[in-house]
Amino acid sequence: MTASTLPRSDVEFTTLDGLTLRGWLFPASQRGPALIMSPGFNMPKDAILPDIAKWFQEHGITCLLYDPRGIGASDGEPRNDIDARQQAEHLHDAVTWFKENPLVNEKQIALWGLCFGGNVTLAAAAFDKRVAAAIAVAPLIDSTGNPERRQPILELAMHDRASRLDGEEPMYLPYVNEDGSIPNGLQLAAEMMPALERLGIPVENRISVQTYYKSLSWNILNVVQYISPTPAMMVTPELDVSCPTEDQLNCFEHMKEPKELDILKGKGHLDWVFGDVESILNRQLDFLKRHMAF
């Protein structure tokens, strides 16, 4: 992708629960379709998505990219406390705010999410029919983790709740350990955090214990059937280990028409951003054009 000369501005909006979420607006050159983008698990808006937002901006789509609650520039305490249901609700508030922008055709607002953001995007699209289309890229489907870690996580969560009632600070765990494992037993690439540091992406390597308590009660498979009749596209790397390919395909099977699947041959969770990303994004643009008529 080439460097963009189009503008980017700082924006903020208020959620129903009184928080201010802050992000970036990538305005297209004229009024038309719009895209709200959601980053990965415990990730700020800076991670990977700005270049993709610029690409869509250059192709006539106004994009909104913001830090989720408790991350980066956005409000929310405790910090790094991730709640899928709450993030989906905040996407509803983002739509409410975004549709008032003079550059945005309120009938052509789509959602786009990466990894955990893909999960949240699917959930928000299931319940908010103001959304015209949804794209989930390498979505994290099962966030409950290794069953052997369930009881230790719950015990930590109960200890944390009791301690906080006594005035203690929230309990945190490393987001990613040196070997690439995360607290619930799932495995990420060991080089992920060092790579983000080299790229200058400000990811805090910590996450609240309560994040994993909340994840144990969240199952996207219970809601994806309600996305229809909103058109949805799933973009699945063939060799995804971080968000297993088979989980993504199983989720796609649970979804109803209209739906489209784009399998990225030979690609892992994030390495699709290197190489021929243009063709991948062009297929997503074609999906949006066909279903949002622009």
UniProtKB/Swiss-Prot annotation:
A GO molecular-function annotation: transferase activity
Disulfide bonds: none
Family per similarity comment: Belongs to the polyketide transferase af380 family.
Active site residues per record: C115, D240, H269
Alphabetical GO biological process terms: antibiotic biosynthetic process; monocarboxylic acid biosynthetic process
Domain of life: Eukaryota
Entry keywords, A to Z: Transferase
The name this protein goes by in its record: Polyketide transferase grgF
Subunit structure: Homodimer.
EC number(s) on file: 2.3.-.-
Function (record text): Polyketide transferase; part of the gene cluster that mediates the biosynthesis of gregatin A, a fungal polyketide featuring an alkylated furanone core. The PKS grgA synthesizes C11 and C4 polyketide chains in the presence and absence of the trans-enoyl reductase grgB, respectively. The polyketide transferase grgF is then responsible for the fusion of the two carbon chains to produce the furanone skeleton of gregatin A. GrgF first undergoes a conformational change to an open form, and the active site Cys-115 is acylated by the C11 chain.
Pathway entry: Secondary metabolite biosynthesis
InterPro entries xref list: AB_hydrolase_1, AB_hydrolase_fold, Polyketide_trans_af380
